[in-house]
């Protein structure tokens, strides 16, 4: 029965109308083998050509044999299959990143315009519930979308409206690790949901319905605010805070790899409402640029000679810049020039001087330009000086001076050290 429902849904939602070569992610489990059977059966009706992609995670002794069998199945079906083996330290995140990077690579090499995965309704309920437990923002409780941009094409999840109990019995591999509670998703699936189902046997559907309502609410708010210019400061500041939050969240959707914390989001909101002509470094090599009329977020470009260039240090990063080695939290041996107290709660910005820079020295704010003049630094030395900034405050200048803000032991948040070592080149 699922076959006809599946075909009907694919046609009604026009999943493949713009796609000819389709990449199917296949693990060998019941979900992906069911999807393989469905897409293979309806290739002509959907006017698609299938290509398979499989990742061998190398975590079970059966993994190599399963990869071999999948290749044999693909050969019998006359479908091309490409495989890759995971390498590195295994975790849920590292494995997921490896998979999707491989899928992007295959899509490009094989000229595929769509990646298809076998996520289903049970996965959707688990995902929403996991996000609730992690304290995700409301918009992310809408769950996975059945289609979204991916790898220059589209990611399609055509089984999201089907429960695993709807799947027919087909040849597949059973992964014994799915029954172990080492990973968060397994604990949700094997422990939390069975407990919740004793209170409400339809808890999964209730969670999915909640996600659907949230998605509808987000869509309604988006439609109601579509005529507002999100990046016009005058328009933005006229809105109530609740509307500002929504507008900023909508704008940040354009940068999926930015991943701001709530504190970082609130900091941007504060800047947009109080600052003018402002330049603020975020994370993951993004920056916020604000003038008197508008603001924008953009990726920081490759390093050049511009004084506006900046480098972001995350906790435990070690880098060499000009004539210095900077180590965030890891002690350097020998020849340490400076030790600046910092916080691991956000990144450190290394940059050159900017107009209006101020530093706290001897208990007073002092213009950086005046400090350089008083200390008789040459113009070249001023231009080459590396500013250490965190929480929008200058904490020091590499090899020159440390701000009182950083020295002040009463700032309990500054419990880590940025080590700066002079390099002889």
UniProtKB/Swiss-Prot annotation:
Name assigned to this protein: tRNA(Ile)-lysidine synthase
Family membership noted in the UniProt record: Belongs to the tRNA(Ile)-lysidine synthase family.
E.C. code: 6.3.4.19
Binding-site residues for ATP, renumbered to this chain: 27-32
Function: Ligates lysine onto the cytidine present at position 34 of the AUA codon-specific tRNA(Ile) that contains the anticodon CAU, in an ATP-dependent manner. Cytidine is converted to lysidine, thus changing the amino acid specificity of the tRNA from methionine to isoleucine.
Protein source organism: Streptococcus gordonii (strain Challis / ATCC 35105 / BCRC 15272 / CH1 / DL1 / V288)
Record-linked SUPFAM superfamilies: Adenine nucleotide alpha hydrolases-like (SSF52402), PheT/TilS domain (SSF56037)
Record-level Gene Ontology MF annotations: ATP binding; tRNA(Ile)-lysidine synthase activity
Catalytic activity, as annotated: cytidine(34) in tRNA(Ile2) + L-lysine + ATP = lysidine(34) in tRNA(Ile2) + AMP + diphosphate + H(+)
Lineage of the organism: Bacteria, Bacillati, Bacillota, Bacilli, Lactobacillales
Disulfide bond entries: none
Keywords linked to the UniProt accession: ATP-binding, Cytoplasm, Ligase, Nucleotide-binding, tRNA processing
Main subcellular location of this protein, as a coarse class: cytoplasm
Domain notes: The N-terminal region contains the highly conserved SGGXDS motif, predicted to be a P-loop motif involved in ATP binding.
Gene: tilS
């Amino acid at each position: 029965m699922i076959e006809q429902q599946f075909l009907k849904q694919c046609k009604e939602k026009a999943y493949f109308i713009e796609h000819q070569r389709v990449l199917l992610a296949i693990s060998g489990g019941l979900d992906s083998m069911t999807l393989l059977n469905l897409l293979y059966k309806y290739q002509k009706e959907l006017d698609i050509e299938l290509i398979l992609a499989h990742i061998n995670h190398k975590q079970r002794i059966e993994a190599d044999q399963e990869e071999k069998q999948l290749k044999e199945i693909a050969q019998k079906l006359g479908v091309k299959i490409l495989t890759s083996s995971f390498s590195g330290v295994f975790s849920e995140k590292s494995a997921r990143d490896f998979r999707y990077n491989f899928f992007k690579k295959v899509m490009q090499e094989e000229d595929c315009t769509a990646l298809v995965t076998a996520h289903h309704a049970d996965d959707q309920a688990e995902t929403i519930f996991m996000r609730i437990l992690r304290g995700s923002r409301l918009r992310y409780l809408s769950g996975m979308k059945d289609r979204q941009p991916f790898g220059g094409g589209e990611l399609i999840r055509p089984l999201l409206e089907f429960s695993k109990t709807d799947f027919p019995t087909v040849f597949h591999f059973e992964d014994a690790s799915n029954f172990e509670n080492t990973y968060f998703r397994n604990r949700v699936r094997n422990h939390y949901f069975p407990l919740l189902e004793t209170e409400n046997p339809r808890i999964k559907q209730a969670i999915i319905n909640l996600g659907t309502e949230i998605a509808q609410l987000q869509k309604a708010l988006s439609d109601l605010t579509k005529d507002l210019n999100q990046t016009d400061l005058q328009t933005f500041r006229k809105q109530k805070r609740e509307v500002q939050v929504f507008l900023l969240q909508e704008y940040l959707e354009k940068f999926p790899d930015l991943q701001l914390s709530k504190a970082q989001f609130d900091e941007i909101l504060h800047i947009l409402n109080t600052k003018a002509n402002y330049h603020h470094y975020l994370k993951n090599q993004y920056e916020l640029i604000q003038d008197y009329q508008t603001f924008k977020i953009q990726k920081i470009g490759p390093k050049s000679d511009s004084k506006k260039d900046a480098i972001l240090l995350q906790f435990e990063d070690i880098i060499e810049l000009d004539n210095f080695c900077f180590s965030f939290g890891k002690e350097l041996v020998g020849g340490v020039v400076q030790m600046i107290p910092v916080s691991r709660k956000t990144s450190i910005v290394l940059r050159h001087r900017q107009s209006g820079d101020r530093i706290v020295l001897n208990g007073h704010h002092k213009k950086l330009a005046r400090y350089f003049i008083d200390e008789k630094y040459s113009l070249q030395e001023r231009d080459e000086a590396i500013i250490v900034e965190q929480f929008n405050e200058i904490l020091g200048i590499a090899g020159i001076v440390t701000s009182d803000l950083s020295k002040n032991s009463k700032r309990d948040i500054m419990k880590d050290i940025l080590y700066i070592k002079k390099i002889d080149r």
